[in-house]
């Protein structure tokens, strides 16, 4: 019995030593392979930050441009927290103008290059080209931002008509914002 227990204990120690030397698999970097070509970031750029934006989008009821007597819900601006994959807030996204700001105070705006359908009930996927960052920090050198994995955020279903011009509606949304810098 003592021999069996000693052998079992030795096996546990040996296996524990092996296990402690094994490292956890490296976290997967975001892959854009499954995204529509229109919103893929050009070669020569690499992912430097992956965030999950959780927040709200405000829409305002306005008269349609060049369509007398017609009205529509118009995107008025986002307000979201940017969280890292572990759930820690690393920044915020707000506007207008659309602004991504790191907790270190650096921030940037961007110019939309393309959109692609995000699925029924979801705002579109988006690719933007970053303008030069303001302030030193994480946003310095960012070249592109992708909005992917969108959930919600579409204009409200309630009617927008002459009687409620100027009314605002807030809808919840979530999206991943992937930040790139030149390789």
Specify the residue positions occupied by each region the protein language model found.
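Primary mode marks residue(s) on the alpha4-beta5-alpha5 output face of response regulator receiver
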Residues: 25-56, 65-183
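Bacterial signal peptide processing site
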Residues: 19-21
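Bacterial N-terminal signal peptides that target proteins for export
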Residues: 1-8
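C-terminal motif of bacterial Sec signal peptides marking the signal peptidase cleavage site
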Residues: 14-17
């Amino acid at each position: 019995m003592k021999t069996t227990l000693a052998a079992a204990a030795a096996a546990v120690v040996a296996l524990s030593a092996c296990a402690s030397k094994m490292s956890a698999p490296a976290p997967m970097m975001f892959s854009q392979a499954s995204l529509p070509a229109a919103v893929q970031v050009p070669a020569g750029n690499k992912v430097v930050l992956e965030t999950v934006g959780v927040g709200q989008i405000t829409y305002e009821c306005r008269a349609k441009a060049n369509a007398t007597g017609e009205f529509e819900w118009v995107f008025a601006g986002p307000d979201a927290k940017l969280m890292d994959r572990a759930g820690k807030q690393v920044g915020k996204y707000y506007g207008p103008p659309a602004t991504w700001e790191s907790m270190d105070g650096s921030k940037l705006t961007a110019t939309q290059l393309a959109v692609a359908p995000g699925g029924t009930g979801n705002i579109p996927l988006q690719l933007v080209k970053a303008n030069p960052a303001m302030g030193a920090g994480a946003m310095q050198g960012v070249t592109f931002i992708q909005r992917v994995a969108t959930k919600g955020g579409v204009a409200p279903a309630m009617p927008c008509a002459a009687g409620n011009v100027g009314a605002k509606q807030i809808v919840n949304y979530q999206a991943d914002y992937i930040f790139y810098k030149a390789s």
